[in-house]
Protein backbone atom coordinates (compact mmCIF):
# COMPACT_ATOMS: atom_id res chain seq x y z
CA UNK A 1 0.00 0.00 0.00
CA UNK A 2 1.32 3.45 -0.93
CA UNK A 3 1.81 5.80 1.99
CA UNK A 4 0.31 9.28 1.80
CA UNK A 5 1.21 12.41 3.74
CA UNK A 6 -1.52 14.95 4.49
CA UNK A 7 -0.81 18.52 5.47
CA UNK A 8 -2.15 22.05 5.45
CA UNK A 9 -0.47 25.30 4.46
CA UNK A 10 2.83 26.77 5.55
CA UNK A 11 2.73 28.81 8.78
CA UNK A 12 0.02 26.47 10.07
CA UNK A 13 -2.98 27.64 12.05
CA UNK A 14 -5.42 25.60 14.12
CA UNK A 15 -7.61 24.57 11.18
CA UNK A 16 -4.62 23.41 9.15
CA UNK A 17 -3.23 21.23 11.96
CA UNK A 18 -6.56 19.86 13.18
CA UNK A 19 -7.81 19.20 9.64
CA UNK A 20 -4.68 17.22 8.78
CA UNK A 21 -5.03 15.09 11.91
CA UNK A 22 -8.77 14.59 11.36
CA UNK A 23 -8.38 13.70 7.67
CA UNK A 24 -5.70 11.17 8.57
CA UNK A 25 -7.96 9.58 11.18
CA UNK A 26 -10.79 9.30 8.65
CA UNK A 27 -8.57 7.66 6.06
CA UNK A 28 -6.93 5.33 8.60
CA UNK A 29 -10.39 4.10 9.55
CA UNK A 30 -10.84 3.23 5.88
CA UNK A 31 -7.59 1.28 5.82
CA UNK A 32 -5.25 3.86 4.32
CA UNK A 33 -1.57 4.21 5.18
CA UNK A 34 -1.48 7.94 5.91
CA UNK A 35 0.30 10.35 8.23
CA UNK A 36 -0.54 13.93 9.14
CA UNK A 37 2.48 16.25 9.03
CA UNK A 38 3.00 20.00 9.32
CA UNK A 39 4.93 22.59 7.33
CA UNK A 40 5.82 24.97 10.15
CA UNK A 41 5.87 25.70 13.86
CA UNK A 42 2.69 25.66 15.93
CA UNK A 43 1.19 28.94 17.05
CA UNK A 44 0.19 29.39 20.70
CA UNK A 45 -3.50 28.79 20.04
CA UNK A 46 -2.88 25.47 18.31
CA UNK A 47 -0.42 24.44 21.02
CA UNK A 48 -3.16 25.13 23.59
CA UNK A 49 -5.63 22.97 21.65
CA UNK A 50 -3.28 20.00 21.29
CA UNK A 51 -2.33 20.21 24.96
CA UNK A 52 -5.98 20.46 26.03
CA UNK A 53 -6.96 17.32 24.14
CA UNK A 54 -3.61 15.61 24.80
CA UNK A 55 -2.68 15.13 21.16
CA UNK A 56 0.88 14.96 19.88
CA UNK A 57 1.71 17.54 17.23
CA UNK A 58 2.18 16.22 13.69
CA UNK A 59 5.77 15.73 12.59
CA UNK A 60 7.48 18.76 11.03
CA UNK A 61 8.67 18.28 7.44
CA UNK A 62 10.51 20.55 5.01
CA UNK A 63 10.02 18.36 1.94
CA UNK A 64 7.86 15.34 1.11
CA UNK A 65 9.08 13.88 -2.19
CA UNK A 66 11.95 12.21 -0.33
CA UNK A 67 9.35 10.18 1.62
CA UNK A 68 6.27 9.65 -0.54
CA UNK A 69 4.96 10.02 -4.07
CA UNK A 70 1.39 10.96 -3.10
CA UNK A 71 0.02 13.68 -0.82
CA UNK A 72 -3.32 15.10 0.28
CA UNK A 73 -3.88 18.79 0.97
CA UNK A 74 -6.20 20.29 3.55
CA UNK A 75 -7.07 23.94 4.20
CA UNK A 76 -5.21 25.20 1.11
CA UNK A 77 -4.62 24.57 -2.57
CA UNK A 78 -2.39 27.40 -3.81
CA UNK A 79 1.06 26.06 -4.58
CA UNK A 80 3.01 28.93 -3.04
CA UNK A 81 1.32 28.15 0.29
CA UNK A 82 2.19 24.45 0.12
CA UNK A 83 5.30 22.37 0.64
CA UNK A 84 8.32 23.53 -1.36
CA UNK A 85 8.54 20.37 -3.48
CA UNK A 86 4.81 20.08 -4.20
CA UNK A 87 5.55 19.81 -7.94
CA UNK A 88 7.52 16.61 -7.32
CA UNK A 89 4.61 14.62 -5.88
CA UNK A 90 1.08 13.69 -6.95
CA UNK A 91 -1.78 15.43 -5.17
CA UNK A 92 -4.49 12.80 -4.78
CA UNK A 93 -6.97 14.77 -2.67
CA UNK A 94 -7.81 18.30 -1.56
CA UNK A 95 -10.29 19.32 1.13
CA UNK A 96 -10.48 23.10 1.40
CA UNK A 97 -12.67 26.15 1.96
CA UNK A 98 -10.64 28.83 0.17
CA UNK A 99 -10.51 30.23 -3.34
CA UNK A 100 -8.91 28.04 -6.00
CA UNK A 101 -5.81 29.65 -7.50
CA UNK A 102 -2.48 28.57 -8.95
CA UNK A 103 -3.54 24.94 -8.80
CA UNK A 104 -3.64 22.26 -11.47
CA UNK A 105 -2.86 18.56 -11.69
CA UNK A 106 -1.99 16.17 -14.50
CA UNK A 107 -4.15 13.39 -13.07
CA UNK A 108 -7.73 13.26 -11.75
CA UNK A 109 -8.08 13.67 -7.99
CA UNK A 110 -10.60 13.95 -5.19
CA UNK A 111 -11.28 17.67 -4.77
CA UNK A 112 -13.75 19.00 -2.25
CA UNK A 113 -14.14 22.71 -1.62
CA UNK A 114 -17.14 24.30 0.05
CA UNK A 115 -17.88 27.93 0.97
CA UNK A 116 -17.94 27.35 4.72
CA UNK A 117 -15.96 28.88 7.55
CA UNK A 118 -13.70 25.95 8.30
CA UNK A 119 -12.24 22.83 6.70
CA UNK A 120 -13.33 20.59 9.57
CA UNK A 121 -16.96 21.48 8.88
CA UNK A 122 -16.48 19.70 5.56
CA UNK A 123 -14.57 16.86 7.18
CA UNK A 124 -17.41 16.18 9.61
CA UNK A 125 -19.64 15.59 6.58
CA UNK A 126 -17.05 13.21 5.16
CA UNK A 127 -16.92 11.20 8.38
CA UNK A 128 -20.70 10.82 8.29
CA UNK A 129 -20.89 10.08 4.57
CA UNK A 130 -18.39 7.27 5.07
CA UNK A 131 -20.05 6.09 8.29
CA UNK A 132 -16.90 6.59 10.34
CA UNK A 133 -17.35 7.51 13.98
CA UNK A 134 -15.71 10.71 15.21
CA UNK A 135 -13.77 10.05 18.41
CA UNK A 136 -14.04 12.37 21.40
CA UNK A 137 -10.50 13.64 20.84
CA UNK A 138 -10.88 14.26 17.12
CA UNK A 139 -14.22 15.97 17.77
CA UNK A 140 -12.42 18.34 20.13
CA UNK A 141 -9.83 19.14 17.49
CA UNK A 142 -12.44 19.69 14.79
CA UNK A 143 -14.48 21.93 17.09
CA UNK A 144 -11.37 23.95 17.94
CA UNK A 145 -10.70 24.52 14.25
CA UNK A 146 -14.21 25.90 13.72
CA UNK A 147 -13.93 28.18 16.75
CA UNK A 148 -10.58 29.44 15.50
CA UNK A 149 -11.52 30.06 11.88
CA UNK A 150 -14.86 31.69 12.71
CA UNK A 151 -13.66 33.63 15.76
CA UNK A 152 -16.27 31.83 17.85
CA UNK A 153 -18.90 32.40 15.12
CA UNK A 154 -18.27 36.17 14.88
CA UNK A 155 -16.44 36.12 11.55
CA UNK A 156 -18.40 36.88 8.34
CA UNK A 157 -17.02 33.59 7.00
CA UNK A 158 -19.13 31.68 9.52
CA UNK A 159 -22.11 29.81 8.08
CA UNK A 160 -25.04 27.99 9.61
CA UNK A 161 -23.30 24.76 8.64
CA UNK A 162 -20.32 25.72 10.82
CA UNK A 163 -22.58 26.44 13.78
CA UNK A 164 -24.46 23.15 13.44
CA UNK A 165 -21.22 21.21 13.05
CA UNK A 166 -19.76 22.90 16.12
CA UNK A 167 -22.78 21.96 18.22
CA UNK A 168 -22.53 18.33 17.16
CA UNK A 169 -18.79 18.21 17.79
CA UNK A 170 -19.12 19.89 21.19
CA UNK A 171 -21.54 17.18 22.26
CA UNK A 172 -19.11 14.45 21.22
CA UNK A 173 -16.11 16.22 22.77
CA UNK A 174 -18.10 17.05 25.92
CA UNK A 175 -17.01 20.68 26.10
CA UNK A 176 -18.90 23.95 26.53
CA UNK A 177 -18.43 25.92 23.33
CA UNK A 178 -18.48 29.42 24.83
CA UNK A 179 -16.24 28.88 27.84
CA UNK A 180 -13.77 26.64 26.02
CA UNK A 181 -13.86 28.85 22.94
CA UNK A 182 -12.99 32.04 24.80
CA UNK A 183 -10.24 30.27 26.74
CA UNK A 184 -8.80 28.98 23.48
CA UNK A 185 -8.98 32.30 21.63
CA UNK A 186 -7.42 34.19 24.55
CA UNK A 187 -4.58 31.67 24.66
CA UNK A 188 -3.89 32.48 21.03
CA UNK A 189 -4.32 36.22 21.56
CA UNK A 190 -1.71 36.45 24.32
CA UNK A 191 1.23 38.09 22.58
CA UNK A 192 3.23 38.98 25.70
CA UNK A 193 5.80 36.25 25.16
CA UNK A 194 5.83 36.18 21.36
CA UNK A 195 8.89 37.08 19.33
CA UNK A 196 8.48 39.44 16.39
CA UNK A 197 8.68 36.46 14.04
CA UNK A 198 5.88 34.79 16.00
CA UNK A 199 3.70 37.89 15.66
CA UNK A 200 3.94 37.45 11.88
CA UNK A 201 3.71 33.67 11.96
CA UNK A 202 0.23 33.39 10.42
CA UNK A 203 1.20 34.66 6.97
CA UNK A 204 0.07 33.57 3.52
CA UNK A 205 1.44 34.52 0.12
CA UNK A 206 -0.85 35.29 -2.82
CA UNK A 207 -0.43 36.11 -6.48
CA UNK A 208 -2.69 39.03 -7.36
CA UNK A 209 -2.57 40.09 -11.01
CA UNK A 210 1.14 39.18 -11.17
CA UNK A 211 1.87 40.96 -7.90
CA UNK A 212 3.39 39.02 -5.01
CA UNK A 213 1.40 39.81 -1.89
CA UNK A 214 1.88 38.47 1.61
CA UNK A 215 -0.86 38.91 4.20
CA UNK A 216 -0.20 38.14 7.86
CA UNK A 217 -2.80 38.27 10.60
CA UNK A 218 -2.80 38.03 14.37
CA UNK A 219 -5.67 38.01 16.87
CA UNK A 220 -5.28 40.10 20.02
CA UNK A 221 -7.36 41.54 22.84
CA UNK A 222 -5.51 44.88 22.62
CA UNK A 223 -3.95 46.04 19.34
CA UNK A 224 -1.49 48.22 21.26
CA UNK A 225 0.23 45.05 22.47
CA UNK A 226 1.47 44.70 18.89
CA UNK A 227 1.61 48.34 17.83
CA UNK A 228 3.99 49.08 20.71
CA UNK A 229 6.50 46.89 18.85
CA UNK A 230 5.78 48.37 15.43
CA UNK A 231 9.38 49.30 14.64
CA UNK A 232 10.50 45.69 15.09
CA UNK A 233 7.51 44.39 13.15
CA UNK A 234 8.08 46.75 10.24
CA UNK A 235 11.76 45.85 10.11
CA UNK A 236 10.92 42.16 9.72
CA UNK A 237 8.18 42.92 7.18
CA UNK A 238 10.67 44.94 5.14
CA UNK A 239 13.18 42.12 5.30
CA UNK A 240 10.53 39.67 4.06
CA UNK A 241 9.76 41.98 1.15
CA UNK A 242 13.43 41.96 0.15
CA UNK A 243 13.93 38.23 0.68
CA UNK A 244 10.80 37.16 -1.20
CA UNK A 245 10.54 39.92 -3.79
CA UNK A 246 7.12 41.01 -2.52
CA UNK A 247 5.18 43.94 -3.93
CA UNK A 248 3.08 44.29 -0.80
CA UNK A 249 3.16 43.04 2.78
CA UNK A 250 -0.02 43.65 4.77
CA UNK A 251 -0.19 42.82 8.48
CA UNK A 252 -3.73 42.70 9.88
CA UNK A 253 -3.95 43.06 13.67
CA UNK A 254 -7.42 41.93 14.74
CA UNK A 255 -9.08 42.73 18.06
CA UNK A 256 -11.23 39.69 18.89
CA UNK A 257 -13.27 41.70 21.40
CA UNK A 258 -14.26 44.60 19.12
CA UNK A 259 -14.13 42.76 15.76
CA UNK A 260 -12.06 45.53 14.19
CA UNK A 261 -8.52 45.54 12.85
CA UNK A 262 -5.54 47.79 12.29
CA UNK A 263 -3.45 47.31 9.18
CA UNK A 264 0.26 47.85 8.70
CA UNK A 265 1.24 47.97 5.03
CA UNK A 266 4.70 48.14 3.48
CA UNK A 267 5.82 47.82 -0.13
CA UNK A 268 5.47 49.46 -3.51
CA UNK A 269 1.73 48.72 -3.74
CA UNK A 270 0.39 50.07 -0.44
CA UNK A 271 -1.82 52.46 -2.43
CA UNK A 272 -3.86 49.43 -3.50
CA UNK A 273 -4.83 48.81 0.12
CA UNK A 274 -5.76 52.47 0.53
CA UNK A 275 -7.99 52.29 -2.54
CA UNK A 276 -9.54 49.00 -1.47
CA UNK A 277 -10.62 50.23 1.96
CA UNK A 278 -10.87 53.98 1.46
CA UNK A 279 -8.21 54.66 4.08
CA UNK A 280 -4.95 56.59 4.25
CA UNK A 281 -1.90 54.96 5.75
CA UNK A 282 -0.08 57.23 8.19
CA UNK A 283 3.37 55.93 9.08
CA UNK A 284 2.34 52.65 7.41
CA UNK A 285 -0.71 52.26 9.68
CA UNK A 286 -4.46 52.56 9.05
CA UNK A 287 -7.70 51.39 10.71
CA UNK A 288 -9.61 48.55 9.03
CA UNK A 289 -13.04 48.85 10.61
CA UNK A 290 -15.07 45.66 10.77
CA UNK A 291 -12.35 43.60 9.11
CA UNK A 292 -11.70 40.27 10.84
CA UNK A 293 -11.43 37.72 8.02
CA UNK A 294 -8.42 37.52 5.70
CA UNK A 295 -10.25 34.99 3.52
CA UNK A 296 -13.45 36.98 3.03
CA UNK A 297 -12.63 40.62 3.77
CA UNK A 298 -9.04 41.00 2.60
CA UNK A 299 -8.00 38.58 -0.13
CA UNK A 300 -11.05 39.04 -2.44
CA UNK A 301 -11.07 42.83 -2.05
CA UNK A 302 -7.36 43.21 -2.74
CA UNK A 303 -7.55 40.75 -5.63
CA UNK A 304 -10.31 42.81 -7.25
CA UNK A 305 -8.49 46.09 -6.64
CA UNK A 306 -5.24 44.80 -8.12
CA UNK A 307 -7.19 43.67 -11.20
CA UNK A 308 -8.52 47.17 -11.94
From Swiss-Prot:
Binding site for Mn(2+) 2: 15, 75, 97, 149
Top-level taxon: Bacteria
Binding locations of Mn(2+) 1: 9, 13, 75
GO cellular component: cytoplasm
Keyword NADP annotated: no
Enzyme class (EC, first level): hydrolase
Any matching Pfam family: DHHA2
Annotated S-S bridges: none
Protein name: Probable manganese-dependent inorganic pyrophosphatase
Organism: Listeria monocytogenes serotype 4b (strain F2365)
Lineage: Bacteria, Bacillati, Bacillota, Bacilli, Bacillales
